[in-house]
Structure formats: structure tokens, C-alpha cells
Regions:
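RNase H-like nuclease fold core
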Residues: 1-76, 80-85, 173
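Intrinsic structural disorder
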Residues: 1-2, 33, 62, 93, ...
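Short conserved micro-motifs on helix faces and helix-strand junctions that flank
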Residues: 15, 90, 190-192
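Residue-level signal for alpha-helical context at structural boundaries
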Residues: 38, 55, 78, 88, ...
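Intrinsic-disorder/low-complexity, polar/charged segments
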Residues: 49-53, 90, 122-129
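Acidic/histidine-rich catalytic cores and adjacent linkers
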Residues: 65, 72-76, 116-192
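Conserved beta-strand -> loop -> alpha-helix junction used to position metal-binding or nucleic-acid-contacting
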Residues: 69-118
């Protein structure tokens, strides 16, 4: 799809990229420059894939755009595809990921504490959030590592799988949740 050019296009772009779905198999993938507030690429897509995002970014580079940074929803492998470009994982999407694992009303004390901690993300710096996440882990490590044994097979699995998944998601994504702090000169957003 072609975008009508109303304003001069920027030479440098801070890319916010996301796909919005209308129904199950029709989506619109948009790459927008957060500086000029212009959509630089708009495509109809059936599915959201890393290959489509890579192709859209390559097309922008071929048009002469210098991609200064990327803010995205954190699809698996997407942030690692562009090691030369500072990439920020959308903090709002990270909160949604934790919500998917814990629900909005966790039942356990550990889950409630992690849910409250997750809500401090937007107001925290990396060092403070990392320290609070580590303190949460140290307080709840035993609970997090509890295992349940299947009496028939003798095999075991983690009892609190969704809590572990929520914690590990935050821990794994920590470096990408605060990229904007490491590059203040770029004026990066922390959310899509």
C-alpha cells in the first residue's frame, strides 16, 4: 500500500512498529516514525511475522532512511534480528504478557507481589527495577521452584508454571525494556 506524502519525509527515523488485527486473518502492519509522527510503511498482512518486519525495515533502508532505533511488541526473535540497531521492547506489551500468565487477579502472594512489581515498570529505571525483581526472586525462590510429582510416572514438573513464566519473561526481556535509558540522545519511546 502506498502512503501519500503530506510532509517531507525524515532522513533519520525512530521506528515504532506493530500490527493490529481486524478479525482473525486481516491485519495492518505499520512502521511509524516517532519523531515526525508519520507512518513510513503500511501493509496489509494475514499473519504477523519477523520476516515481514525485516522486509519492511529493509525497504525503508533502501529508500534512504537511517533507522536510529526500533520500538516493538517483543515478538520472539525480532529484537535479536537487528543487533546493530538499538531496540526497545514496549513496556505496555510486557505488562500484557505478565497479565496473560498471572491474570489480573493473581491468587498467590508471590503472584500478587510480581503483578504489583510489574506495574512499577513504567515509572522505574533499569537499575531500580532489576534490583526489585531480584529481591522478589530471592523472597519467593523456594515457592517458584516447588515441584509436583506425578505418582503414576514418577516425573515431576514445576508447580507454579505460569508464575515462573511471568518472572522469566521479565528477567529475559530486562535488557530490552530499558534501551531508551541507554540512548537518551535518540529520544526513544518506551512503548508502542
Amino acid at each position: 500500500m502506498q502512503i501519500r506524502e503530506r510532509y517531507p519525509l525524515p532522513e533519520k527515523a525512530n521506528i515504532i512498529m506493530d500490527t493490529t488485527y481486524f478479525g482473525r486473518s486481516f491485519g495492518v502492519m505499520v512502521l511509524m516514525d516517532s519523531i515526525s509522527q508519520q507512518a513510513l510503511s503500511v501493509d496489509e498482512v494475514k499473519y504477523e511475522t519477523n520476516a515481514l518486519y525485516a522486509a519492511a525495515l529493509d525497504a525503508l533502508k533502501e529508500k534512504g532512511f537511517e533507522i536510529q532505533n526500533i520500538v516493538c511488541d517483543g515478538r520472539k526473535g525480532l529484537l535479536q534480528m537487528f543487533p546493530e540497531i538499538p531496540a526497545q521492547l514496549c513496556q505496555f506489551h510486557q505488562v500484557k504478557t505478565v497479565s496473560r500468565y498471572l491474570t489480573r487477579n493473581p491468587k498467590t502472594a508471590a503472584g500478587k507481589a510480581l503483578w504489583r512489581l510489574t506495574f512499577t515498570l513504567k515509572d522505574s529505571g533499569k537499575t531500580a527495577f532489576q534490583g526489585a525483581l531480584q529481591a522478589w526472586f530471592e523472597q519467593h525462590e523456594g515457592f517458584l521452584n516447588e515441584r509436583t510429582v506425578n505418582e503414576e510416572s514418577g516425573s515431576s514438573h514445576y508447580t507454579h508454571k505460569t508464575l515462573r513464566s511471568a518472572y522469566l519473561s521479565l528477567k529475559r526481556n530486562l535488557d530490552y525494556l530499558f534501551t531508551f535509558e541507554a540512548h537518551p540522545e535518540l529520544g526513544m519511546c518506551n512503548t508502542t
